[in-house]
Amino acid sequence: MPSAPSAAAPDTVLVVDFGAQYAQLIARRVREARVYSEIVPSTMPVAEMLAKNPAAIILSGGPSSVYAEGAPRLDREIFEAGVPVFGMCYGFQLMATTLGGTVDNTGAREYGRTPLHVSKSGSTLFEGTPDEQPVWMSHGDACSAAPEGFTVTASTDVVPVAAFENDEKRLYGVQYHPEVMHSTHGQQVLEHFLYRGAGLTPSWTTGNVIDEQVELIREQVGTRRAICGLSGGVDSAVAAALVQKAIGSQLTCVYVDHGLMRQGETEQVEKDFVAATGVQLKVVDAEERFLTALKGVSDPEEKRKIIGREFIRVFEQAQAEIIADEGPEVAFLVQGTLYPDVVESGGGTGTANIKSHHNVGGLPEDLEFELIEPLRKLFKDEVRMVGQELGLPDEIVQRQPFPGPGLGIRIVGEVTKERLDLLREADAIAREELTAAGLDREIWQCPVVLLADVRSVGVQGDGRTYGHPIVLRPVSSEDAMTADWSRLPYDTLAKISTRITNEVADVNRVVLDVTSKPPGTIEWE
């Protein structure tokens, strides 16, 4: 079969990542404006960036000072190529110093919510926004003079140049972070850059994503076959549905029952997903294999990598069986990898490896499959929209996120069958009560964690007990890059706690995790 032509690339905004905490959020905000965005490292040569033919470029914030030795730099060429550029925070200061402006280390630091005074209300970025507006600052250096040819459009009480514009060269910058919700009119300012400054039209949709991926998948797979691991979660389900739309019966889904799933998960996969898609499904019972491999292991990184390794080995076995049954080569493995997975596994410049995800950093080096990752550049909310567009039912699309390694990384300590059964019971109670209270759509997810290596004293009945604590970790988020703990009603928390301590053996304490992300990740391991 001849190869299909490469999918036409949409107008693309490049987000240059200087190691900013919010670099991924910038990309997401651009996409919310229905313009496609991609992230590139600041170490990429400018010529290589321009070779991507970007419709616009955004320079992210970053932790460095523009005067620090070894601080990220950019070739001046990026500002002279005729491509619209928007600098934020560090990107703003880098634009200023590169083009002849002045940035000083004045000691006048601004962190958090700050009043911005707009002096040019009719400017490209600020038209239609208030003259006084709260913005989110995070900087130590300050711009005291704009480059020649730039108009200063805003200031703060301590920073004389908090925003500037050069409409002729289509160069714009702000000292603050317009991408965070604390900058009340930040999205409007960003859209003004995209639509007015860069002249882009809001045309990127989930339909575009589906069409592009279908074409790319068909080109990649050709006449060969693919298998996809279904985990019971949203990501793998949407990835499988998207690949099936592209190659139909050339896809076989494999559900690995590794014994680390929640209560009723296997039955739900067989019932909901197969009924919705009609996909070919092979179920593999691998509980004993996984528990044997995890025996005696408490280190979370080691657990993740063992689960990733065994997952692939089971797939290789399933591959051989599918070939024996159906003939053509199974050369591809479909994975529901998302943008945050890649970032947290060290995929962004200037960012640390927070944890290895089983479908990113946890794969063995001798992997025998070529990967298909149709969701790799999408955030969770975008994945849900793609799922809805593909016709998947709400029972699948609106499910709360659940990690591929399953309950194996919600047990702090060694994973055993007894501990899994205990955690399954507690998790089922929490999910049941959250659903009964109508809170499923109010929270992003609620991991239930067993502190298996910890015991606490309790009193149950007339006797002293020495049982395990269970941790509830309800969080609210838009994309899993940042999260806040959810303020659940006390009555709901009380019901969950009472039921768990009454109904689950060896648990005598339920605690609530009230940590945001950062500093804590959503999952405990």
UniProtKB/Swiss-Prot annotation:
Sequence ranges assigned to domain GMPS ATP-PPase in this UniProt record: 204-399
Domain spans labelled Glutamine amidotransferase type-1: 12-203
Xref: Pfam families: GATase, GMP_synt_C, NAD_synthase
GO cellular component, one term: cytosol
Keywords: ATP-binding, Glutamine amidotransferase, GMP biosynthesis, Ligase, Nucleotide-binding, Purine biosynthesis
CDD domains (UniProt xref): GATase1_GMP_Synthase (cd01742), GMP_synthase_C (cd01997)
Annotated EC: 6.3.5.2
Pathway info: Purine metabolism; GMP biosynthesis; GMP from XMP (L-Gln route): step 1/1
Domain of life: Bacteria
PROSITE patterns on file: GATASE_TYPE_1, GMPS_ATP_PPASE
Catalytic center residues: C89, H177, E179
Residues binding ATP, per UniProt: S231, G232, G233, V234, D235, S236, A237
Main EC class the enzyme belongs to: ligase
Molecular function GO labels: ATP binding; GMP synthase activity
Catalytic activity: XMP + L-glutamine + ATP + H2O = GMP + L-glutamate + AMP + diphosphate + 2 H(+)
Role description: Catalyzes the synthesis of GMP from XMP.
Subunit architecture: Homodimer.
Protein name (record): GMP synthase [glutamine-hydrolyzing]
Organism expressing this protein natively: Streptomyces avermitilis (strain ATCC 31267 / DSM 46492 / JCM 5070 / NBRC 14893 / NCIMB 12804 / NRRL 8165 / MA-4680)
